[in-house]
Amino acid sequence: MSRIHYELANVESPFAWRSKFALAHKGLAYESRRTAFTDIPTICEGRHKTVPVLVDEDGTETCESMAIASYLDEKYESATPLLGGGRQARTEEIEGLLGPHGFQAFFPLYILDIHNGLPEKDAAYFRESREKRFGATLEELSNNRDERLPAAREGLQPLRDALGDKQWYDGDNPGYTDCVVLAFFAFIKGCAKTPPLAAGDPLLGYIERGFALYDDLGNSIQGGPLA
């Protein structure tokens, strides 16, 4: 059987993109199967409640991006490692920055854009589940985006500082930490109707290098400009 990667349809998932970058890092081909939010319970006969899900050529099923990265390192150890050599600690460190300074700052600003790009059935599910999670309407969450964007951009400074003058977050060569960061910007690029970054942001050079990896994988995303 072919290797299958289940990911969301109609919206770019940051967690699916982590796995897509990880698979490309390992040089592994796969079939992408895009699945609607409301169809996730049908994946693998209901054995998984979220995506991404990787079904390997031998039928092994792995769910969630970090578990997939660990599985790939264990199964394909001869290929370039994702998490070895202390990289897992580095990934956890950067994830600790990306949560409050990335997802929590930017996701609410673009949450209505995501909703508006979904088909009716998924849009209803997305609205109900996200409004319950955040305790506010999507309109309230994304209100005054233009006025709030400068603070969100400024809040990325810890990520800029962590990169410094290095080419990659994992050092001389990209690793899973870079998959995580690039996946966040892949997600934002795919959903943002207003550029999330300002022109001249030092992160733009890093993103350009990262999106060019693996035969321009990141540049395959359909979306607006990042700045």
Where in this protein do the model-derived segments appear?
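GST-like domain detector, emphasizing the conserved glutathione-binding G-site
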Residues: 1-125
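GST-like fold's C-terminal all-alpha helical module
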Residues: 99-208
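Charge-dense, extended regions
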Residues: 220-227
